[in-house]
């Protein structure tokens, strides 16, 4: 697990710096970027909740005596665990892309000044 995985995106230094920069310069992309960060934060929270619920299911399964029920639950548990793992990986990739985009914009801003903030688009190709 990398720092990107464990650290909430809203607490990332590059993200916080870019949000402040966009806000301070009244950049049109501020609202959209802020909403993106809020959305990713929500996904992080839901994934954390799903992981905690899965842990609780596992603990409850261990106490089951009915083997056929336990086997059925084990299959469901394994499928949910795999889905959560895939979601965690995708979220980690998304966070990395956002953070790298922030780094690139901040580097460009330091080199060119406020003009670097003109035309920032929030989407797959940019942040």
Regions picked out by a protein language model, each given a short descriptive name:
Residues 125-127:
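Conserved small/polar residues in nucleotide/adenosyl-binding loops
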């Amino acid at each position: 697990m990398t720092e990107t995985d464990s650290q909430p995106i809203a607490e990332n230094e590059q993200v916080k710096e870019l949000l402040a920069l966009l806000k301070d310069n009244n950049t049109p992309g501020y609202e959209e970027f802020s909403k993106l960060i809020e959305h990713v934060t929500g996904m992080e929270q839901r994934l954390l909740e799903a992981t905690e619920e899965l842990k609780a299911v596992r603990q409850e399964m261990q106490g089951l005596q009915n083997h056929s029920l336990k086997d059925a639950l084990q299959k469901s548990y394994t499928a949910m665990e795999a889905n959560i793992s895939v979601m965690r990986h995708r979220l980690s990739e998304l966070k990395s892309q956002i953070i790298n985009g922030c780094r690139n914009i901040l580097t460009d801003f330091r080199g060119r000044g406020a003009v670097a903030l003109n035309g920032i688009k929030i989407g797959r190709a940019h942040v």
